[in-house]
């Protein structure tokens, strides 16, 4: 059986995915399906580099500003909803174009979902105790040795996925990367093109984007989110672009430190994305 082919444009943050996908969609009767774990939320705009109003008017977009921060959302939910949305776009004789850089969302969509066993509460509790006693760096090194494929996709400072990786290993004796290989076949064939730029150019674009976000009012956006009653501990706010301004607003960072960390964290994130994207043969260097 031949599955419908879907074009995917992936790539690191600030590479220019949105502009490229919009231009492609305009030429090919397309609609864009966003594979971005944060642009889905209505409250997050500047810090996620969400497409502008003009860009959203130019081409129909999906999974942009569709959920509230109070609604739980995950890669699994996204993959299920995205498959239905892709089928609907095709049924209307339009061309769906997936665009995004969230590796978990792309993994779930392109490779399908896998059933990863839940760990016993005791295992998680023990890991949380170890985290407080040994620190995240020690636990991350343990994960690197046990599941290097999964570890290379993580930010060592983010403990949620780190703990998840270790609890699966301790509960099942198998790494998460093993379960990722057992995924069910998605109902589409995805043609993934990874957009990239020379590293120096990419880093310059990242630094410029951070400066532009601050000029556009990132600090005010974060203040409004916190004043609306959202906890800084919810997962979408514990991400690059929001955690740094929150630390600044709470007095933990100076303004200059916040800018430097925001740029550094974003560059580090781009490196992790590119490591994951190496699995795809089709790479396109933009200039």
Placement of each model-derived feature along the sequence:
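Phosphate/pyrophosphate-binding catalytic cores of soluble transferases and nucleic-acid-acting enzymes
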Residues: 1-287
């Amino acid at each position: 059986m031949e599955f419908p082919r879907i074009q995917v444009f992936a790539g690191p943050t600030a590479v220019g995915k949105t502009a490229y996908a919009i231009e492609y969609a305009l030429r090919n009767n397309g609609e864009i399906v966003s594979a971005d774990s944060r642009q889905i939320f209505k409250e997050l705009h500047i810090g996620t580099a969400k497409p502008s109003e003009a860009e959203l008017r130019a081409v129909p977009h999906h999974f942009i500003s569709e959920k509230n921060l109070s609604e739980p959302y995950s890669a699994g939910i996204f993959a299920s909803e995205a498959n239905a949305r892709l089928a609907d776009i095709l049924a209307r004789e339009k061309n769906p174009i997936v665009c995004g850089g969230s590796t978990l969302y792309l993994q779930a969509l392109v490779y399908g979902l896998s059933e990863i066993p839940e760990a016993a509460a005791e295992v998680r509790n023990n890991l949380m105790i170890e985290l407080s006693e040994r620190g995240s760096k020690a636990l991350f090194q343990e994960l690197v040795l046990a599941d290097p494929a999964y570890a290379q996709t993580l930010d060592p400072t983010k403990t949620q996925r780190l703990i998840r990786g270790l609890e699966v290993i301790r509960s099942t004796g198998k790494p998460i990367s093993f379960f990722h290989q057992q995924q069910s076949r998605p109902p589409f064939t995805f043609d993934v093109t990874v957009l990239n730029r020379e590293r120096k150019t990419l880093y310059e674009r990242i630094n410029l984007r951070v400066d532009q976000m601050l000029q556009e009012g990132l600090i005010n956006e974060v203040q409004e989110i916190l004043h609306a009653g959202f906890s800084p501990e919810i997962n979408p706010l514990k991400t690059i672009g929001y955690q740094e301004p929150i630390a600044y607003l709470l007095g933990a960072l100076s303004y200059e430190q916040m800018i430097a960390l925001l740029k550094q964290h974003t560059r580090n994130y781009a490196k992790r994305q590119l490591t994951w994207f190496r699995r795809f043969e089709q790479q396109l260097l933009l200039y």
